[in-house]
Structure formats: structure tokens, C-alpha cells
């Protein structure tokens, strides 16, 4: 019989936070994870429960309505004290200093073979309906459609001036294998798409779900462009934050890299000139910025617009029998607040 893990035996996580599954095992051993087998609906209930427990420890839902092959995680970054423990930071000041040091000393990511990559245990090329492999959510009854808002884009190599970029883009797959891809003006992705709009070329990317926590943290580093300009190595900084290089793998169907330890990956390309409405309601009215949609991080900014489109060429995933984990990341919570401010705080420092 294995000796039970006691809190007094535990040390700040290092290797344990290099992928999401081992992170959750470590959090559970620490007593910092809520786990439930009760059914939860991605429509309103996931985010409703997260908001009710805002600022508490992470929550894993093992029984998701309509999604028998997925689990859903929220609140991973909801408690700043849990974040500090995950990465071995002694306090808030230590966190800020060490992330600032990671800016100066990125660890170059390592590439592994496709046969080794957990995120490519199963491969589905040319999927008819991407939503089958996702867990779209809805926050409020004002939103007419569910959204995929927690995927982390991965742009590397020549498409990011030789560096690497991580970030969020909300998506709505209204056309099976094609979804809208909202981009914040001024962001790294906006800079990339602006360049390729002029050249009328698609941008190959991957959207990764259930990634190493350090990558989630760096995805919230938007608009720190004095410290993290185009061409920087955000994946390298994430490696420095977790204390070991991030593992990458070549995508199966496009010229892009994926986070090898992700749970699910969408491969494809962004078409800068193929712009479509995010919701059927806004399309029918042919009006941008009037009708409600995903509330966005501030809780009140969500309106439907025309956006570039993401054309999915393949979905790769960990074995679906193991129920890959989607980090749903409800907005206007301490979860996304901590993600969006922690790295920026270090950039200011």
C-alpha cells in the first residue's frame, strides 16, 4: 500500500506543473482541488458555479452534459496563493521578481517527435464539426450562442519574426470546420494578421487546450510590447517560469508547432480576409457591435462583430478514453484576472 502524501511532505511544485494532468494530481494532494462527478451543463452552469466559487481553489468537473469524452476545469488561477504554491514562489514579491527574471532568461523550447507527443495520441483530419471536440460555454442568457474562449494560440517561426507567441482568441464554429476568430486590436496576433492581410496569405497556427500552466500564464501577457515585442520567445519565457523547457511538436497538417503536452489541439490557418459575423443574430441584422456575445474579461464588453476566420484542418487529442480536459476559463472572474495581470505586473516591475 502506498504511503499517503502529507502536506508536510510536499514541496513547492516543479516537475509537477509541466503538464495539466500532473498539476491537478499535485493540487489534489495539496488539498487545493475541488472534484465532482455530478453532471454540469456547459450552458450557464459551469461559469455560474465558477463565479459562485470565485477566488477559491480549482474545480474539475468529471461529468459534463453532452460531452462524455471530456472533463472541464475552471478556477485554476482563481487563488493567487495557490498560483504561488504551484510555481514555488514564496510570496507575491518573489513571484514578480522571478517572472521578470524569466523575461531576461527564456529557456528555448524543445521539439519532440509526433509519436511521443501526448496531444497527438489521436488525430482527426478534416473534421466536419469542430464543436464535437470542444466544450463551448455560455456565461449569460444575453448571449445567443455558446463560445470557445479558452484556446491558446501558438504562432512560431517566420510567422512571428522568428519567435513564439501565446495568446487567447475567442472562437465560434458556426460553419463546422470554420469559426470566427476575434483578435484584439494591437495584440501580437493583430500585428501578424495585419501583415498577412496585406500579403493576402493565410496564417498557419495551432489552438491548444489544456496546456501546461506556465503557458496559460504567458497567454495573458498581451500588450507588454516594450518587454515582449513581436519576435520575442513567449514559449521560452513560459519554460523559464516552470523551470524546464516547454515541449513542442510539429502539427500534422499545417506548417506550425503545437504545445506537445496539451490535451486537445486544433490545427489550421487564419484567413485574414475571410471575415464573418460571430453570431447569426448580428449577421441577420448586418450590424457589428450591437448584439450581445461573449462578455469578455471585463464582463461588459462582449458584442458580436465581424472577425477573421479560423479554418481547421485537423484536431489532435490525447486518447479520448482518458477524457481530455478543457480549461473553460470563465470571464470576469479572478481566474482570468490573475492570468491577465500577473505577467503584466512583472513587465511593469
Task: Please provide the spans of the model-predicted regions.
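Extended, highly charged
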Residues: 2-309, 313-349
Amino acid at each position: 500500500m502506498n504511503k499517503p502524501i502529507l502536506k508536510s511532505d510536499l514541496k513547492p511544485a516543479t516537475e509537477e506543473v509541466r503538464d495539466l494532468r500532473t498539476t491537478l494530481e499535485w493540487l489534489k494532494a495539496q488539498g487545493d482541488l475541488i472534484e465532482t462527478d455530478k453532471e454540469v451543463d456547459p450552458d450557464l452552469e459551469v461559469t455560474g458555479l465558477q463565479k459562485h466559487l470565485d477566488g477559491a481553489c480549482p474545480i474539475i468537473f468529471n461529468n459534463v452534459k453532452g460531452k462524455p469524452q471530456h472533463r472541464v476545469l475552471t478556477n485554476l488561477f482563481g487563488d493567487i496563493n495557490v498560483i504561488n504554491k504551484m510555481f514555488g514562489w514564496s510570496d507575491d514579491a518573489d513571484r514578480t521578481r522571478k517572472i521578470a527574471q524569466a523575461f531576461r532568461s527564456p529557456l528555448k523550447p524543445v521539439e519532440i517527435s509526433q509519436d511521443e507527443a501526448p496531444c497527438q495520441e489521436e488525430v482527426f483530419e478534416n473534421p466536419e464539426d469542430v464543436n464535437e471536440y470542444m466544450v463551448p460555454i455560455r456565461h449569460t442568457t444575453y448571449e445567443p450562442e455558446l463560445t470557445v474562449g479558452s484556446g491558446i494560440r501558438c504562432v512560431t517561426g517566420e510567422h512571428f519574426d522568428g519567435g513564439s507567441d501565446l495568446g487567447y482568441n475567442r472562437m465560434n464554429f458556426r460553419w463546422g470546420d470554420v469559426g470566427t476568430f476575434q483578435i484584439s486590436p494591437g495584440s501580437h496576433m493583430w500585428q501578424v494578421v495585419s501583415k498577412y492581410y496585406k500579403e493576402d496569405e493565410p496564417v498557419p497556427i495551432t489552438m491548444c487546450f489544456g496546456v501546461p500552466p506556465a503557458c496559460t500564464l504567458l497567454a495573458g501577457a498581451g500588450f507588454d510590447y516594450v518587454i515582449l515585442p513581436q519576435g520575442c520567445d513567449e514559449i521560452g519565457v513560459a519554460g523559464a517560469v516552470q523551470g524546464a523547457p516547454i515541449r513542442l511538436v510539429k502539427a500534422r497538417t499545417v506548417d506550425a508547432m503545437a504545445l506537445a503536452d496539451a490535451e486537445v489541439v486544433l490545427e489550421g490557418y487564419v484567413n485574414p480576409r475571410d471575415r464573418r459575423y460571430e453570431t447569426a443574430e448580428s449577421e441577420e441584422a448586418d450590424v457589428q457591435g450591437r448584439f450581445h456575445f461573449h462578455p469578455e474579461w471585463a464582463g461588459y464588453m462582449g458584442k458580436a462583430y465581424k472577425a477573421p476566420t479560423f479554418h481547421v484542418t485537423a484536431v489532435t487529442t490525447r486518447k479520448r478514453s482518458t477524457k481530455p480536459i478543457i480549461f473553460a476559463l470563465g470571464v470576469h472572474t479572478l481566474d482570468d484576472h490573475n492570468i491577465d495581470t500577473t505577467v503584466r505586473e512583472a513587465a511593469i516591475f
